[in-house]
Regions:
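Paired small-residue
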Residues: 186-194
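A late C-terminal transmembrane helix in Major Facilitator Superfamily
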Residues: 25, 216-248
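Helix-to-loop junctions at the C-terminal end of transmembrane segments
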Residues: 148-160, 245-246
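Extracytoplasmic gate region of multi-pass secondary transporters
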Residues: 91-152
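Flexible cytoplasmic inter-helical loops of multi-pass small-molecule transporters
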Residues: 64-87
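Helix-loop-helix hairpin linking two adjacent transmembrane segments in secondary transporters
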Residues: 21-68
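Structural signature of the two symmetry-related core transmembrane helices
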Residues: 163-178
Length: 256
């Protein structure tokens, strides 16, 4: 929706929209750790389920009831105009080689990050970091995700998503090098911090790039396609990580 109805300030709008998720990734781990000291994990899950069932419908209705979906952000004639972009259909996108190249770039983050999150206990034990260290490191991950979100929104509006796309996975690549060559508990913060930077970039670029290249008329179906591939990549990544662990590979070998 944001990609469709924002043009000039799409990057800032997307970064604001993703701000809630990254903030929750910072707050919830701390909150859950505290709640575990006073109640069981079963009670926490029950409470979360009840809160979602009650507040999510109310909040969603309150936020969208006064929205006007017939309007779009106005752009001056002298500035770039999205109406000049050819509006691709999903079947046309599937025939475009650029889609697959971009997808390979975009899917690296969810593919690797999901494996890290699911098997964080294996990484923690292999590196002897300790559960409290990894929990604190996730706070660094969330903080840098938020900071990167806010910065990337302005950069996208200034330079476009296509120019920033090539930088998205550089921090992610550096994080694997950290995992391979360093064992100190301090490197846990660097490791997850670098993943957080790539995550912040990926969240915004994952929506704005498609709108810039393929237009917004069919952005829903195109985004659905890329999201389906993302879900598949996370499932495949998790399975591959598990298989390699069962085969006796070390975390350094997996990262390599």
């Amino acid at each position: 929706t944001i990609s469709r109805y924002f043009t000039k300030s799409r990057g800032k709008a997307l970064s604001t929209g993703w701000f809630g998720l990254s903030t929750a990734e910072f707050i919830l781990p701390v909150l859950i750790v505290y709640l575990l000291t006073i109640t069981s994990w079963q009670n926490i899950w029950i409470s979360v389920s009840i809160l979602v069932l009650i507040f999510l419908p109310i909040t969603s209705y309150t936020l969208i009831k006064n929205l006007n979906f017939d309007s779009r952000e106005e752009v001056k004639e002298t500035e770039h105009k999205e109406k000049d972009i050819f509006q691709w259909k999903r079947i046309e996108v599937l025939k475009d080689y650029r889609f697959y190249i971009i997808c390979l770039n975009m899917l690296a983050m969810p593919w690797i990050a999901t494996g890290v999150f699911v098997y964080q206990s294996f990484i923690t034990e292999s590196k002897d970091w300790g559960s409290f260290v990894i929990a604190q490191s996730f706070m660094v991950y969330s903080i840098l995700s938020v900071v990167t979100l806010l910065i990337s929104g302005f950069l996208i509006d200034k330079f476009t998503s296509r120019k920033l796309l090539i930088f998205m996975n550089i921090p992610l690549s550096l994080s694997t090098l950290v995992l391979i060559f360093f064992d100190s508990s301090m490197t846990s913060f660097i490791f997850l911090g670098l993943i957080g930077i790539s995550n912040g970039l990926a969240n915004v670029l994952g929506s704005s790039t498609w709108a810039e290249i393929y237009g917004v008329k069919h952005i829903g179906s195109i985004k659905a396609l890329s999201t389906a591939l993302m879900v598949f990549s996370t499932a495949f990544g998790t399975a591959l990580f598990g298989l390699l662990i069962d085969q006796g590979y070390s975390i350094e070998q997996i990262a390599f």
